[in-house]
């Protein structure tokens, strides 16, 4: 075989290797961008969402994020960084299917330190409306990441859920009901810890639950059957770290993983039936 024919042969082999197997369709991809704070970067939630999707039959979710610890959405709005962050390749060619917005855990209000009561979510509502407008101008769909109540004040979920669902309805934007799934797990399996010691941030199981809810909300597909272990980009207290070496983000028992997947799917389906 001469050099020219050998080169053509290798090119054909590479094309065939990259093509879908006969009878199979290439998987769809959803590009998802997360905006928020440590409730996103703890345990690398975007990486968990991506890792879960790789092992399921639905679309593959490719993710990126823009986060600052403790940030409110109004601060993401005022610092003006979001449009450039969404153009992560430095050009106007980057597009996103969904941009997920996560508010500070107390809905950007003052929490009563005795009762845990939250104030009016007016700042949250205004910021979401303004950010959603920016997101839609860039051709993406805004989605909302409903957070959970603090361990100390489980009744906070009533206000949190109402605020997210209210603004989601106003904007016709999907709401990932992570907080509601969190409450369901805490009620049914109080032995299955979702918090770290501060009673606010998620441990790996909590972030895994959030990832399952997010996957179900954005794809409309069940997360049941997702892997119990997920590897991805490592993270620290300041956010995801640049590294070529994947880290183990979560490792659950098969029973715990299956339970979290089932609750996530059940809660998302119940929410959509409202």
Language-model features and meaning:
Residues 1-5:
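N-terminal secretory signal peptides that target proteins for export/translocation
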Residues 7-18:
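Bacterial N-terminal signal peptides
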Residues 21-23:
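Boundary at the C-terminal end of the N-terminal hydrophobic targeting segment
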Residues 28, 201, 211-274:
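Conserved catalytic region of serine esterases and O-acyltransferases that act on ester linkages
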Residues 28-33, 140-142:
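Short, surface-exposed connector motifs at secondary-structure boundaries
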Residues 30-33, 39-123, 270:
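Conserved SGNH/GDSL esterase-like catalytic core that processes O-acyl groups on lipids
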Residues 42, 204-211:
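Short alpha-helical patches at coil-to-helix transitions and adjacent helical residues
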Residues 88-207, 216-225:
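Alpha-helical cap/lid subdomain in secreted, periplasmic
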């Amino acid at each position: 075989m001469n050099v020219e024919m050998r080169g053509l042969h290798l090119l054909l082999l590479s094309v065939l290797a990259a093509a879908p197997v006969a009878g199979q369709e290439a998987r769809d991809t959803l590009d998802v961008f997360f905006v928020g704070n440590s409730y996103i970067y703890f345990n690398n939630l975007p990486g968990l969402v991506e890792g879960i999707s790789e092992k399921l039959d639905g679309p593959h979710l490719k993710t990126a994020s823009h986060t600052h610890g403790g940030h409110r959405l109004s601060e993401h709005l005022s610092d003006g960084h979001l449009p450039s962050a969404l153009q992560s390749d430095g050009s106007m060619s980057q597009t996103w299917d969904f941009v997920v917005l996560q508010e500070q855990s107390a809905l950007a209000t003052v929490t009563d330190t005795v009762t845990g009561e939250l104030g009016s979510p007016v700042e949250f509502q205004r910021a979401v409306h303004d950010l959603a407008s920016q997101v839609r101008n860039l051709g993406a769909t805004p989605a909302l990441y409903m957070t959970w109540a603090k361990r100390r004040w489980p009744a906070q979920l009533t206000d949190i859920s109402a605020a997210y669902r209210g603004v989601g309805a106003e904007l016709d934007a999907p709401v990932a009901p992570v907080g509601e799934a969190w409450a369901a797990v805490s009620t049914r399996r109080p032995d299955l810890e979702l918090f770290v010691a501060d009673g606010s941030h998620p441990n790996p199981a909590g972030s895994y639950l959030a990832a399952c809810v997010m996957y179900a909300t954005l794809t409309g597909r069940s997360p049941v059957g997702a892997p119990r272990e997920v590897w991805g980009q490592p993270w620290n207290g300041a956010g995801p770290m640049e590294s070529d070496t994947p880290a183990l983000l979560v490792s659950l028992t098969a029973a715990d993983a299956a339970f979290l997947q089932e609750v996530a799917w059940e809660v998302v389906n119940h929410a959509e039936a409202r």
